[in-house]
C-alpha cells in the first residue's frame, strides 16, 4: 500500500515528539511505501532535514506557508465568482448565515458550515493563476464589503482586507500544490495539513486518517490570544478561521485518532462525529531503556529535562523553579537536553535568566542521545504549558525515573495512571507554579525510596500500555481495514 503522510510544522525539519512519532511509524511498517507531503513555514527550510529518511519513504513534497509576492502587473487580473463560490467564501469568512447558538460560549463553527468542495474547485481552478486573481477581483471585494458590514462592521474595511488576505494566502497556496497519488492519506494534525488531506481524499476518493497529538485549533487559539501581532478586535476572526480548518479535516476524515481520552472528548465537542474517533496511545521500545549506563555516586543530584528550548516548553519557569530547588539542595544540577537552535531569542533569554539568577549547574546540552544520558539522572522535570502525550515522559518512565510534570495534555494520565492498578510515577503540579514545582522536586530528592517506587511504577505502566509494538500494530490494523474497504468499494463499482 502507498500511504501519503501529511505533516505540518514538524517532520522532517524539527526534532521532537511528533517528528519522532512519524519516524517510528514509517520505520515500523517496512511492508508499506510512504510518501511525505510536508508543510513548513519558510522557503529557507527547504531540504533542511533533521532526520535520515527511512528507505520506505520514497518521495518528499515540500510546501511553505510564507506568502508569495503580490508585486507585478500580471497579478492584477480579477476573476468572476459563481454564486456557489461566493457562498462558500462567505462561509469560510464566517459570514455564511446565522451564527450557531453555542457560538457565544464556544468559538467552534458547525462542521458543515463551509462548502469545501466548492472551495477546492475554486482554489485549484485554472482561472486562478495566482491567489491575487481572487483577492483583487471585484466579486471578492464586493463580498468582503457586504460581509464586513454584516459581521465585521467594527473593523475598518482596509484592515479587514489585509487580515483576510493574510488568512487566505497560506490556505490557497497549500491547496494549489501537487497532490501525490496514494492508496490512503494520513494527516498528522488538522490545520493546513488536515485540509490538504481533505483535498486529496476529495480528488482521488481515497480514505483519510487524521491523527491529532494536541488539539490544533485550541493550540492556535491560545497562541492568538497571547499574540501581539494580531490586534484585539481581529483575534476572533483568526481563531474561528483555524477552527474551520479543523472542522474541514473532521468532516472529510474516515478516522480521527488521538492519544488519550480528553483529546477525543474535545474533538467530539468541536463537531467531530464520535463514530469516527478512536484512541491510539504513543509507544516506545521499552527494553531499549533498561540497564542504561548510570553515573557513579558522587553526591550530586541530577535533574533532567528532555525538551526543546522553545516558549511552549516554558523553560523560564523551569529555571526559576531550579533556583528555588538550589536553595534547598545545593548539590542539585539541571540538564536541559534538547535542541537549542529552534528557540532563537527565547533561548538567549533563558541563558540570560540563568546568569541573572547567579545559578550554577544549569547545563544546556543541545541535541543528545537521550538513552546515553537518562541513566545518569535522578529525577525528570517537565514544565510545559501545552503538551499532547509526551514521548519524553514515556522515555523517562521506561528508564525507571520519577517525574515532576505540569498538568497539561495527558501528563496526569501518564504519571498517575487511569485505573491500571499501578501507583503514581511522579508528581503532577500546576502550570507555571514555580513554588509547587520546586517543592515536588525537593520532596522526591529527599526520599530515595519514593523515587525508586515511582520509577518502578512508571516502567511497568509503559511496559503494559505504551509499547512501540502496540502502537504500530494499531495503525497497521487501521491501514489494512481502510485499504480493504477501499478495495471492496472499487470492486463493487466495477
Regions found by a protein language model. Give the residues of each.
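Conserved donor-binding/catalytic core segment of Leloir-type glycosyltransferases
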Residues: 293-324, 335
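Conserved acidic donor-binding segment of nucleotide-sugar-dependent glycosyltransferases
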Residues: 416-418, 422-434, 443-448
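Glycosyltransferase donor-sugar binding loop
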Residues: 333-348
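Aromatic "clamp/platform" in nucleotide-sugar-dependent glycosyltransferases that forms part
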Residues: 385
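Nucleotide-activated donor-binding/catalytic signature segment of Leloir-type glycosyltransferases, i.e.
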Residues: 347-367
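A short, well-ordered alpha-helix in the C-terminal region of glycosyltransferases
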Residues: 201, 436, 443, 450-481
